[in-house]
Amino acid sequence: MKRITIIAGHYGSGKSEISVNLALNKKIDYIVDLDIINPYFRSRALNEVFEENNIKLIESTIEGMLNSDMPYVSGAAAVPFVQDHISAIYDLGGTENGGRVLIQFVDRIKKIEDIDMLYVVNIFRPETADKDKIIKAIQKLEGESQLRVTGLINNTNLMHLTTEEEVLLGEQVLDEVSKELNIPIVYTVVEETHDFEHQFKGERIKLSRLVARKWL
């Protein structure tokens, strides 16, 4: 995993759960919430999890109206970009303009070599249900953020009802995207309660639903 990892995906893709799980599993220093609309990381219980694991949370701070064409977040979000001893996961907003918040950091980001921007896909979400929709969403994100997506995360699921075949179906769709855009599948997400035997593409993330649980 790179020192800086930006996790992107459409609303409801599961990117926030993945961000938390990766931060815990990979012992990341910072998790940066760049979602200025939906405060998924702000529950007290989830913050306790971060504190127990020595993960610093940087939350979004709106400096202007929510509907601004160029929303800005706290300057603290830039700290991992300029201090190369800090590892961080950036969780982008899943709204239509979620990638725009990165523009204020783009000059710093482009100087970093040890960085990935990963796109999370659940093909059972209508916005990313097939190859063409996924490619369109990725290209839109790249246009907004002025950055390139470097990897794909297969998070195809129907929560606890998910079957191995459904995860494989998501992999098949993402294989098509991967070949067309030349972007590898770097992670496949499987809930920790499932014991699927298939060797999926990329590294397997055994997902614990911490965000959904702590949000309640």
Regions flagged by a language model, labelled:
Residues 12:
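Walker A (P-loop) phosphate-binding loop of P-loop NTPases
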Residues 15:
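Conserved lysine of the Walker
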Residues 60-66, 86-101:
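Switch II (G3) loop of P-loop NTPases
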